[in-house]
Structure formats: structure tokens, C-alpha cells
Amino acid sequence: MRSSIDVHNHLLAEDVVHELSQLAGPLRDLSTAPGVLGLPPVAVGRPTLLADEDGAVVVLAPADAEVDTAGVAELLGRDRLDPVPPDRAPGLTGYLLAFVPPVALECPSTLVVDERVASQDVVYAAAGEPGVILKVRGADLVKATSAVVAPVTRQAS
């Protein structure tokens, strides 16, 4: 399994200024991070992992939003993209499903960032393990990863 050290080393190699913060306790997933950290949901990019025969797609969406998976597949022209089940995520990415980071995956991957998250000065995202969070400038993350930025979410009801 990979860890936040892999995320840190990847971002260092790309000259991306970032912070990894140890949390007081582990999060179940990033949907609870805004309340724990005192942040608006749009500042926390919660990962959704999709995959097809061409590799993985990590979608960062506001913590309170649902990803439009069909919309992401259409946006990327990859109609066979499907959500990755929790038991398959570690073998594919090297990380537990709820904590898949935006970088340093073991497989080929594309990063898609919802435009509301990408527009934030600072984005908080999974760092690869339950008790650690990644803090990075939204523009730096998009630039370093050549992320696709688009409106790919719908508000959770």
C-alpha cells in the first residue's frame, strides 16, 4: 500500500507547494472533513474513483456533492468508465477507496476537478491515508496534473 509519503514525494518532484497535515483522528471519508476542519464543503475535494480499460479517473468534487459519473464519461469520451468498488481500489491505485489522492497512483490516471473546487485558492484533498489531509493551491494542483476542470457534480439532496 502507498501512503501520504508517496503523495508528498510526487508533489515535491513536480515543485508543487503543499502541506500534509496530521488530523486529530481518522476520518471515515472526506465527506465529514468540512465539519472536522471548519471549512466550507467546496474547499474539500472528495475523491470519486472511476476506471475502465484505459486506467483510472479520480474526480475531486465538493464534499457535499455527488459526481455525475455519466457526465464525466461523456466529458472524457470514455463510455466504459464505472465506479471502482472498495475492494478493487487498493490493487488498482495503491490506496483505500475513501482516501485516494489526486496524485501518485500506481496505475495510469486522469484527474478531473469540479470547477467549484478548482476555483478555490486552497483545496483540501485525500492524502492517501485516513489520518492525513493534503492542502494545496487549487491552481497548482490543476497545473501540475494537467487536470480536466469542468462542472461534473450535482448537489446532494
What are these regions (language model features)?
Residues 1-157:
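Extended, low-hydrophobicity, polar/charged segments
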